[in-house]
């Protein structure tokens, strides 16, 4: 039984559906749904591959946002409760 783990879309106004924050938001929702699916179906390797692709896309967007605007990046990380990027 899959529970709806999606994050409330009220965080993002309708005008900003293409912004980096909204893209990270929607990718995070997909990550949560795929993670729940993989807990039930552990051998679904195509879904595992899809999860890795989504995670890499989200990471690219977060790297871009952290370089462009650190305050927006920090705010987004706090709202979505995801880990910060590893820095060298």
From Swiss-Prot:
Protein localization: Plastid, Chloroplast
Any one of the GO BP annotations: translation
Matches recorded under InterPro entries: Ribosomal_uS15, Ribosomal_uS15_bac-type, uS15_NS1_RNA-bd_sf
Keywords from the UniProt entry: Chloroplast, Plastid, Ribonucleoprotein, Ribosomal protein
Pfam families to which the protein is assigned, alphabetical: Ribosomal_S15
Main subcellular location: plastid
SMART domains in the cross-refs: Ribosomal_S15 (SM01387)
GO cellular component: chloroplast; ribonucleoprotein complex; ribosome
Disulfide bond residue pairs: none
Lineage: superkingdom: Eukaryota
GO MF term (any one): structural constituent of ribosome
Quaternary organization: Part of the 30S ribosomal subunit.
Family as reported in the entry's similarity comment: Belongs to the universal ribosomal protein uS15 family.
Classification via HAMAP family: Ribosomal_uS15_B
Name the UniProt record assigns to this protein: Small ribosomal subunit protein uS15c
Organism: Pinus koraiensis (Korean pine)
Lineage: Eukaryota, Viridiplantae, Streptophyta, Embryophyta, Tracheophyta
């Amino acid at each position: 039984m899959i529970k709806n783990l999606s994050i409330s879309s009220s965080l993002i106004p309708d005008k900003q559906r293409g912004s980096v924050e909204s893209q990270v938001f929607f990718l995070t929702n997909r990550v949560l749904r795929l993670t729940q699916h993989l807990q039930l179906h552990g051998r679904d390797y195509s879904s595992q591959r899809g999860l890795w692709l989504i995670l890499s896309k989200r990471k690219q967007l977060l790297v871009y946002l952290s370089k462009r605007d650190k305050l927006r990046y920090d705010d987004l990380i706090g709202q979505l409760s995801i880990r910060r990027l590893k820095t060298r």
